[in-house]
Amino acid sequence: MGLKMSESAKPYFAMVCLQFGYAGMNLVTKVVLDRGMSHYVLVAYRNAFATAAIAPFALLSERKVRPKMTFPIFMQIFVLALLGPLIDQNLYYAGLKLTSPTFAGAVTNIVPALTFIISIICRMEKVEMRKVRFQAKVVGTLVIVVGAMLMILFKIPLITFLRSHLTGHALSPAGEDYLKATVFLLIASFSWASFFVLQAATLKRYSSHLSLSTMVCFMGTLQSTALTFVMEPNLSAWNIGFDMNLLASAYAGIMSSSIAYYVQGMMTKQKSVIFVTAFNPLVVIIGSIIGFLILNQTLNLGGVLGMAILVVGVCTVLWGKEGDIDEEENIEEKFVEIVKCCNRCDIKVLSMMPRIDEEVDVEMQSAGTAKVAVGFS
């Protein structure tokens, strides 16, 4: 029983660890972006590091089981690279540069909701409004969106709010225009959600997720490099040394691209795309706590309320999705039992039936008896 529980906890542990990696990536890349590094160059280097890190494992471990590459699968990989490395990463970094890791993470908390909607449109998620589990997924998704909106709209320092509430002084919140960054982050979120859904569909036709992750990173490297040459014609923008720029590129590529794509693909095959995206809100929670404890960042009232609501939403979605997974596993177990039962019945029937050589012997004996009877007559 203990072994079974530990096996069932591995997907949750893997996804939580992955969110810590994303939170660290946000903090590190924010530093290099503020220092002037081009986000186009950062994306190109990130995917180059990701390809170099994951390609050897794909070549060695999946060389005998890799499915045949077809043109439709190649086009899906091309679109995956377009949605993930090119559009999502560039627009996310553009929004991150204009705002903060907390704000960027709060806006992208709508990814679970977008993924849920796209999955329903693509008929990857069943609409069963009468079932409590489906209702839980809907309610949990809405709760996540509400928590994200709180973290975005209420940028009021908690200490200032408490002080003003006690003293009766009016608040004067700073008017900061985040419209441009919000547009970038919303488009990036839609692209990221579409990436998850297309990745799940591609894995059904191309099951080697390690090789798939490698090809997505490699295709993303080619696409982002071409875009960088167009957007950054000055070749000096590519200059990189043994500094923070190199660390950010390597960390983002290895942790947030190669490992992330692999783990997300594996969890998508084992669980579902809704399960994978449900953990995304943890990034902003982890980032806010790290920023408050280590970087002395201000803890916002909206952040505190939003984080509490996000946790409730994530748990609700996971509870609803886990019920679907249990039902699917029960159906599979029943199907296997039926197949085994049918096989046993077939074996029993076949064992009762005479073999071909026995049938031939019976026919020969019958023919011989008939000839003897004719002779006597």
UniProtKB/Swiss-Prot annotation:
Record family assignment: Belongs to the drug/metabolite transporter (DMT) superfamily. Plant drug/metabolite exporter (P-DME) (TC 2.A.7.4) family.
The name this protein goes by in its record: WAT1-related protein At3g56620
GO molecular function: transmembrane transporter activity
Taxonomic lineage: Eukaryota, Viridiplantae, Streptophyta, Embryophyta, Tracheophyta
Topology in membrane: Multi-pass membrane protein
Cellular compartment(s): Membrane
Cellular component GO terms, alphabetical: membrane
InterPro entries recorded: EamA_dom, WAT1-related
PANTHER family per record: WAT1-RELATED PROTEIN
Keywords assigned: Membrane, Repeat, Transmembrane, Transmembrane helix
TM helices/strands, residue ranges: 13-33, 40-60, 67-87, 102-122, 142-162, 183-203, 210-230, 235-255, 274-294, 299-319
Major subcellular site: membrane
Domain EamA, residue spans: 22-152, 190-318
